[in-house]
């Protein structure tokens, strides 16, 4: 029975579609055993708004997040007898000060967990568009190695100070990287030393790396992380989970058949499923076999939706 540890809805994310209730209903229809709500955390500065949010103010984002948590709790109450539902959030690490905001949100809402993601390098978005990726590159003197280094330094800072249970799309920095930059990524000793350090640190505190299938719909031949990284994680004894990173009901379980082939190719036979702890306190992590994750999966979505 499938799982997803990372998702969004158009109700609370402007670049997604559909209502949160539509998302969980689709997950139930497809036979999911466990599904996590993880809308984006709000940002507290006007300069950090995305182009799609320029008509808003930071206080609007905080109001939306509050509405999200309340709706997620309602849905858990209504559907919790049909599916394991967790209520978390995906981090917005824009600068070091962002971590204090994340901690305050967790204190206020007692979230089940964070998906620890980095979408910005030196406060510039790196996964919103190729143009903004290039802007981030220009900020570091058009030195792709430095851009990769800064990304993994940000990721390390986030992990050290927040200990997110799930590490989101570990190599997102590569999404819009042109071929010459990808060669730098592949061959840079400095970059790979940071990668190994980050993986080792996550393993040390019990962090879980997601196999994120959204990379397939964005044109990759693998999920996040790419194969060399995934093999390194396995070598270091990392825990792995599965995420569709769906942005609406039309993407629930999308490309999971490709993920199964990818995991089989990499020799991965088990994944982690996150559940609430005894009496509803905290979370517990259970190991499930890859074959069990795909049993009773009724994938109703297409292959190439974006």
UniProtKB/Swiss-Prot annotation:
GO biological process: L-histidine biosynthetic process
Pfam families listed in its UniProt record: PHP
One MF annotation (Gene Ontology) recorded for this entry: histidinol-phosphatase activity
EC nos: 3.1.3.15
Keyword check for Secreted: no
Family statement drawn from the similarity comment of this UniProt entry: Belongs to the PHP hydrolase family. HisK subfamily.
Catalytic activity: L-histidinol phosphate + H2O = L-histidinol + phosphate
Pathway in which the depicted protein is active: Amino-acid biosynthesis; L-histidine biosynthesis; L-histidine from 5-phospho-alpha-D-ribose 1-diphosphate: step 8/9
Name of protein: Probable histidinol-phosphatase
Listed GO CC annotations: cytosol; nucleus
Gene3D superfamilies attached to this UniProt entry: Metal-dependent hydrolases
Enzyme type, top EC level: hydrolase
NCBIfam families with a match to the protein in the record: hisJ_fam
Organism (species): Schizosaccharomyces pombe (strain 972 / ATCC 24843)
Keywords on record: Amino-acid biosynthesis, Histidine biosynthesis, Hydrolase
């Amino acid at each position: 029975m499938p799982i997803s540890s990372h998702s969004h809805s158009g109700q609370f994310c402007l670049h997604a579609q559909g209502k949160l209730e539509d998302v969980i209903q689709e997950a139930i229809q497809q036979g999911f055993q466990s599904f996590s709500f993880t809308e984006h955390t709000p940002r507290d500065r006007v300069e950090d708004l995305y182009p799609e949010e320029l008509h808003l103010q930071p206080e609007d984002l905080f109001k939306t997040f509050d509405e999200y948590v309340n709706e997620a709790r309602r849905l858990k109450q209504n559907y919790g007898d049909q599916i394991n539902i967790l209520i978390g959030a995906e981090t917005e690490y824009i600068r070091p000060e962002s971590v204090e905001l994340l901690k305050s949100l967790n204190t206020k809402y007692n979230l089940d967990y964070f998906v620890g993601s980095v979408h910005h390098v030196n406060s510039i978005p790196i996964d919103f568009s190729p143009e903004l990726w290039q802007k981030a590159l220009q900020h570091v003197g058009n030195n792709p190695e430095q851009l990769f280094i800064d990304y993994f330094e940000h990721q390390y800072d986030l992990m050290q100070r927040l200990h997110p249970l799930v590490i989101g799309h570990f190599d997102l920095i590569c999404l819009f990287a042109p071929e010459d930059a990808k060669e730098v990524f592949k061959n840079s000793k400095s970059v790979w030393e940071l990668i190994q350090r980050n993986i080792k640190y996550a393993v040390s505190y019990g962090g879980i790396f997601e196999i994120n299938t959204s990379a397939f719909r964005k044109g990759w031949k693998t999920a996040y992380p790419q194969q060399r990284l995934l093999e390194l994680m396995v070598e270091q004894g990392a825990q792995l989970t599965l995420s569709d990173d769906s942005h609406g009901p039309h993407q629930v379980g999308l490309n999971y058949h490709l993920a199964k082939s990818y995991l089989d190719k990499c020799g991965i036979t088990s994944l982690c499923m996150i559940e609430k702890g005894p009496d509803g306190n905290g979370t517990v992590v259970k190991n499930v076999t890859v074959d069990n994750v795909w049993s009773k999966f009724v994938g109703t979505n297409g292959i190439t939706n974006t």
